[in-house]
Amino acid sequence: MISNQDNIIQVSAPGKIILFGEHAVVLEKTAIASALSLRTTVTFTPNTNNTLLLDFPDLAGFGVREWSLDEFKKLDHFPNDIDILKPIECSELFQQELNKIIDIKGIHTFLFLFCALTKCTKAYNIKITSDLPIGAGLGSSASFCVSICAGLLKAFDTYICGGCKQCIGGQGQQQQICNEQLNLINLWSLQGEKIMHGTPSGIDNAVATFGKALTFTRKNGYKILENGIPPLRILITNTRVSRSTKTLVEGVIQRSKLYPTLIDPVSNLIDTISSQCIESFNQYHTDKDYEKLQQTMDLMFDMNQHLLSGCYGVGHSSIDTIVSITKSLGFHTKLTGAGGGGCVITLLKQDTTIDQLSNLKLTLSSNGFESWEATIGDPGVSINILPIQK
């Protein structure tokens, strides 16, 4: 068998949206997150220069950088003694060492994962591209981390399963990944997320790894919806309004503490919306069921949006504007994630035409918003092995 170190490895992982339950999840309720058709793609090509070349065109001001592998090996606290099958956090001391090389958190994450998973024993040219806007709450960093981890583990034939038949495949085809290996990818990507976000929930990297959709509670963690969800069409719109997730979350918690008799019923209702959503997904079997599902989802979008904005107080005038525009054109919209700006999602109809979609996007654009069409319920991380052309 040809080693994967002699091949080009191309990996992609999806972004994510929160369908229902945002903010209620911090009050011990259920959130539903789904994988997006918008993905990050990472291509690993071996080189003979004893260097790590990173091409990251989507990261503003980064471009292409190249380092000698020896430069990393000489760093104090280099993660040489890490057991790859037992993911651990990047030490604060090694982060300080990486900061001497480059002062960008996202690149610290990449370099830690590269050093930990390869020990800098093989040189690569690595190119990262993404459909996902950075910093918009769509899981771009988790998609990035999962793609990096999956690719490096594959490149070095590192399998927690010992290399089961499911994980070993030939060239030119999409590789299968067993659940044990997916769990390893997920845990390593979480360590990368910690560098960028401190104490991430783990939702984003789980969605990017396993795909489809999952439920999440603070008490029980995440649970994958094994039946998946229907491939609903959505339009994601970026308000271009930055916000502090921490401040918004703290505001909801404060309201809950001050007015529990008012906020608790709201949280319970949002939890019921999540449950109704799952029940509707389970009742969907063919395209004939789409219209009924659409009606339910339209109602759930409207109700959840009103509760988030009016009762939790995480709305914003930009969100209200988008809700109003889309409603005038016959669509239903809710915020996704933290609110206070960020992104919103609009449910498209199964028969929404190209002209209708173009008109919707043009109207939003003329009001200063940027939007992307996507589907939800997409597959998780995928790996393709390609031979090097000689």
From Swiss-Prot:
**Active site positions, chain numbering:** 204 (proton acceptor)
InterPro entries for the chain: GHMP_kinase_C_dom, GHMP_kinase_C_sf, GHMP_kinase_N_dom, GHMP_knse_ATP-bd_CS, Mev_gal_kin, Ribosomal_Su5_D2-typ_SF, Ribsml_uS5_D2-typ_fold_subgr
Which annotated residues bind Mg(2+)?
141, 193
Q: Which cofactor does it need?
A: Mg(2+)
Tell me where in or outside the cell this protein is found: Cytoplasm
Domain of life, per lineage: Eukaryota
BP terms from Gene Ontology:
isopentenyl diphosphate biosynthetic process, mevalonate pathway; phosphorylation; sterol biosynthetic process
- Gene Ontology cellular component list: cytosol
As its record notes, the protein acts as a catalyst of: (R)-mevalonate + ATP = (R)-5-phosphomevalonate + ADP + H(+)
Group of enzyme by EC: transferase
Q: Which PANTHER family match?
A: MEVALONATE KINASE
Q: Which family does it belong to?
A: Belongs to the GHMP kinase family. Mevalonate kinase subfamily.
Q: What does this protein do?
A: Catalyzes the phosphorylation of mevalonate to mevalonate 5-phosphate, a key step in isoprenoid biosynthesis.
Q: What is this protein called?
A: Mevalonate kinase
* Organism (species): Dictyostelium discoideum (Social amoeba)
Per the record, the gene is: mvk
